[in-house]
């Protein structure tokens, strides 16, 4: 009740924050005259002065006004660009660990230099995170002269970079790179076999460009390092032959069946489910194909893998469409990012879905993979001491930024007021009517000589629009994931008079459409241009620029609404940069996917009530409100999915922290001899307790079993039965002491043979390998647990609580297994005298060979089961590990040494 009145009196929280920061802006401006008077050398010397003042106890906040003034003056001298006052507010927002929402053309890259310079003074490093390698390299090289003028070093990290070059990049004051590369390097560091192999320092401060893309759109995409799993390509091909024989079961709203079939599709949740008839039919077909034994159920425990393949095939055929969710290029399935319209090379779908699509498209089927290490962007970026970001569209997701990352969103006022006119949506009954109206709007704008940008949601729609324009004889350019190599050239001239560009939401980010075209691109196309040529190009551009402004600026036409309001706002934001005129209009039809799935009934009834005829459009605030409500519904659902995935991953994340802390402590330790001694005692106590229960009678002791376990786990044969027969005073406690003494003596002899230093090095390498191998198996087990845990809901149990309880139990088992397997391997190993330096060099070579065969790619975030709000076969970043070509035994076969253990848990650890 009083909220509107209070807001009117005191302003919104955002307005109050801006007012607060304007006071600091005044202080920065007061320094300007003093900075102008400094020579280049004196200005550069300010960096050393600031570092000295920090060392003496001053804080970054105290340095901020003068440091910002130094950065602004350096920007003027080096880049020819002076930070506006609103850009100073943006810099303060980033420094305070918030998200700065700035409109297109407001100079986000320049804003970043203020907070980056200030925080780099601490010497702890600053990471500038971008969405792709091109932007990382472009921004780093663009701003490098400014930072180097101020005495700071700049590094760029990228995939396939030589290790020494990458370490140097991370050691720089400021490091540019992509979110994927920073995340993968974190995982690589936690698989290193020595401190020298690590890349990253402490995760101090990160500035994320296009922060909504990385922290929201990419939040469901795990980063995974993986090893190759068994080959199932033949099974995918067989299943792919069967799927087209299944038909869809369709029911009307009243429950009337209009088409009997085998499966149903839920478009809202993007799920496909077999019905009873479908189960029976697929079981019969699998039996005929020899894939399922006669009379067996597809739901038998040992057939669940086959069921997964069937569902992967169904999803591939019914939910994933070529030129919509993916394209086929050079014999590979390339996924399309629904948010940017760009392809995502290297990113693969999980749970066999990518292989099923490859089978559907008759491509070579790549092997599945097994997870070795993983994290999510949500958990990785929360590791930074301070996090901030910039984007043109964050306010609609402010709640999520605050609730998950603890980041507040600050809307930075524009340097010039917005002059763009955003028209109401026009809604038509059919898609054909909508496209006809779009063509008419294009013709009208082109008569005036206005540049037009037509935004589409998919490649399919962009190509359909292109075909319609060709029939009309209208010249245009198409920008989508198929023609991405022409992006720079197309965008450079998209603002020229009469230019018509059809684009997917590729054109929504990292691009500025300049009215009149881009004169700098024209100059760059010339070989050794003269001053006269440059002046002429500028003069011609100025005329074109003025001509476009007089006709009304860039007109943006959208062929449909996206699920996210942010993407719609990004498309609108291409027009009206820095106070330029412009306009935007969305054209919709009841056949659009968003309208059909989420908003059509209400709007359709409204249109019927108005008695609308074919070709007529409705332009009403009620319709726009209904669409926005539908978008909010989708955004809310997607937020629930991301939040749910985070809640599950938080469980794994706590375990990940423990394992990585243990691993880093091992790497940092010079000698882990005491750790091994402690492990040996704990494993021995546990082994004895299995066969001699505490406080039990001798008649209850399993002596034969204990002797066998000691031979298996400690590689030592001890006559325990004989000892007991010969010594009446040997009871439980003294027996434990005697066994520990015997085992310790045997290991001491091994130390004498191998040499103390060599064995200590070997112990560390073995413990690291055991830890990595068991952690990999644990991740796989956790993955299986997560996929099936939703079924506990049917037993009236809370799936999340059940997952936490079971994962804790699995983690306790993991910690015990690490100790047990390490001691088993060290006990069984046969040592020979070797020069310590040679031993260390050999182990290092083996570790490097292991690392060199790892693959790093993006796959898809695993779902949480179809009953939950999730997307199975979502994307995920994956990397693969080595497979030994000379390995004669299978990893799950009994070890050759006779221990009775699987090869992977015995001598497979050493080899």
Curated annotation (Swiss-Prot):
Disulfide bonds: none annotated. It catalyses: ATP + H2O + cellular proteinSide 1 = ADP + phosphate + cellular proteinSide 2. Keywords: ATP-binding, Cell inner membrane, Cell membrane, Cytoplasm, Membrane, Metal-binding, Nucleotide-binding, Protein transport, Translocase, Translocation, Transport, Zinc. ATP binds at residues 87, 105-109, 512. May bind 1 zinc ion per subunit. It is found in: Cell inner membrane; Cytoplasm. Zn(2+) binds at residues 895, 897, 906-907. Pfam families: P-loop_SecA, SEC-C, SecA_DEAD, SecA_PP_bind, SecA_SW. It is an enzyme of class 7 (translocase). CDD domains: DEXDc_SecA, SF2_C_secA. Its EC number is 7.4.2.8. Belongs to the SecA family. Part of the Sec protein translocase complex. Interacts with the SecYEG preprotein conducting channel. Has a central role in coupling the hydrolysis of ATP to the transfer of proteins into and across the cell membrane, serving both as a receptor for the preprotein-SecB complex and as an ATP-driven molecular motor driving the stepwise translocation of polypeptide chains across the membrane. This is Protein translocase subunit SecA. It comes from Pseudomonas putida (strain ATCC 47054 / DSM 6125 / CFBP 8728 / NCIMB 11950 / KT2440). The gene is secA.
């Amino acid at each position: 009740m009083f909220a509107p009145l209070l807001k009117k009196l005191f302003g919104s929280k955002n307005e109050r924050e801006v007012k607060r920061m304007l006071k600091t802006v005044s202080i920065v401006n007061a320094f300007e005259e003093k900075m102008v008077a400094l020579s280049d050398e004196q200005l550069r010397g300010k960096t050393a002065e600031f570092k000295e003042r920090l060392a003496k106890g001053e804080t970054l906040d105290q340095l901020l006004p003068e440091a910002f003034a130094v950065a602004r003056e350096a920007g003027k001298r080096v880049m020819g660009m002076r930070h506006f006052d609103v850009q100073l507010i943006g810099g303060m927002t980033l420094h305070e660990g918030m998200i700065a929402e700035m409109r297109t053309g407001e100079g986000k890259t320049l804003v970043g230099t203020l907070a980056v310079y200030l925080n780099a003074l601490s010497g702890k490093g600053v990471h500038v995170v971008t969405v792709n390698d091109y932007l990382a390299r472009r921004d780093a090289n663009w701003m490098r002269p400014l930072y180097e003028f101020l005495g700071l070093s700049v590094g760029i990290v990228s995939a396939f970079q030589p290790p020494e070059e990458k370490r140097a990049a991370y050691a720089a004051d400021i490091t540019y790179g992509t979110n994927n590369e920073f995340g993968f390097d974190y995982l690589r560091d936690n698989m290193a076999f020595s401190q020298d192999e690590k890349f990253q320092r402490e995760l101090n401060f990160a500035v994320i460009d296009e922060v909504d893309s990385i922290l929201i759109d990419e939040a469901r995409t795990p980063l995974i390092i993986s090893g190759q799993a068994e080959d199932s390509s033949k099974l995918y091909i067989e299943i792919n032959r069967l799927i087209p024989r299944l038909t869809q079961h369709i029911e009307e709203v009243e429950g009337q069946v209009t088409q009997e079939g085998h499966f149903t599709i839920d478009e809202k949740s993007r799920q496909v489910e077999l019905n009873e008839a479908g189960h029976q039919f697929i079981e019969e077909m699998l039996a005929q194909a020899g894939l399922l034994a006669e009379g067996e159920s597809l739901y038998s425990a040992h057939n669940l893998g086959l069921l997964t393949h069937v569902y992967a095939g169904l999803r591939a055929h019914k939910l994933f469409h070529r030129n919509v969710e993916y394209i086929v290029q050079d014999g590979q399935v390339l996924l399309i990012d629904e948010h940017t319209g760009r392809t995502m090379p290297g990113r693969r779908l999980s749970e066999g879905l990518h292989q099923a699509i490859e089978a559907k498209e008759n491509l070579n089927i790549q092997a599945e993979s097994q997870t070795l290490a993983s994290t999510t962007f949500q958990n990785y970026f929360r590791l930074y001491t301070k996090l901030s970001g910039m984007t043109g569209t964050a306010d609609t997701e402010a709640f999520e930024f605050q609730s998950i990352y603890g980041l507040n969103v600050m809307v930075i006022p524009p340097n010039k007021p917005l002059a763009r006119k955003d028209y109401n949506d026009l809604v038509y009954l059919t898609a054909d009517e909508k496209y006809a109206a779009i063509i008419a709007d294009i013709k009208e704008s082109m008569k005036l000589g206005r540049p037009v940008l037509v935004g589409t949601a998919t490649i399919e729609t962009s190509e359909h629009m292109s075909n319609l324009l060709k029939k009309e004889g209208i010249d245009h350019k198409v920008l989508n994931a198929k023609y991405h190599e022409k992006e720079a050239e197309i965008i450079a001239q998209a603002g020229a008079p009469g230019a018509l560009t059809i684009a997917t939401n590729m054109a929504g980010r990292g691009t500025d459409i300049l009215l009149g075209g881009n004169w700098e691109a024209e100059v760059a196309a010339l070989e050794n241009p003269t001053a006269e040529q440059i002046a002429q190009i500028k003069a011609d551009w100025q005329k074109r620029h003025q001509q476009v402004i007089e006709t009304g600026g860039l007109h943006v036409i959208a062929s449909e609404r996206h699920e996210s309001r942010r993407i719609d706002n990004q498309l609108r934001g291409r027009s009206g940069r820095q106070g330029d005129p412009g306009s935007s209009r969305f054209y919709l039809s009841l056949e659009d996917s968003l309208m059909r799935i989420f908003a059509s009934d209400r709007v359709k009834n409204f249109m019927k009530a108005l008695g609308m005829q074919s070709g007529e459009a409705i332009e009403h605030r009620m319709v726009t409100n209904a669409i926005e409500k539908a978008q909010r519904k989708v955004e809310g659902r997607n937020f629930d999915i991301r939040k749910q995935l985070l809640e599950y991953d938080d469980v794994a994340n706590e375990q990940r922290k423990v394992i990585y802390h243990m691993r880093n402590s091992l790497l940092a330790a010079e000698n882990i001899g005491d750790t091994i001694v402690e492990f040996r005692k704990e494993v021995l106590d546990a082994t004895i307790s299995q066969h001699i229960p505490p406080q039990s009678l001798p008649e209850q002791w399993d002596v034969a079993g204990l002797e066998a376990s000691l031979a298996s786990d400690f590689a030592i044969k001890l006559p325990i039965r004989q000892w007991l027969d010969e010594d009446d005073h040997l009871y439980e406690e003294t027996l434990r002491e005697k066994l520990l003494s015997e085992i310790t003596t045997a290991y001491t002899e091994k130390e004498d043979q191998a040499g103390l230093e060599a064995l200590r090095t070997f112990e560390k390498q073995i413990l690291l390998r055991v830890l990595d191998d068991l952690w990999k198996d644990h991740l796989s087990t956790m993955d299986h647990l997560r996929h099936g845990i939703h079924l506990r809901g049917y037993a009236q149990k809370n799936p999340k609580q059940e997952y936490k309880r079971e994962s804790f139990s699995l983690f306790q088992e993991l910690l015990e297994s690490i100790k047990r397997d390490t001691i088993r391997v060290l006990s069984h190993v046969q040592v020979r005298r070797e020069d310590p330096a040679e031993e260390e060099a050999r182990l290092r070579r083996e570790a490097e060979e292991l690392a060199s065969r790892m693959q790093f790619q993006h796959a898809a975030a695993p779902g949480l089961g179809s009953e939950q709000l999730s997307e199975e076969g979502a994307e995920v970043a994956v990397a693969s590990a080595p497979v030994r070509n000379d390995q004669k035994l299978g990893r799950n076969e009994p070890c050759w040494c006779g221990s009775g253990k699987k090869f992977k848990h015995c001598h497979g650890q050493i080899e």
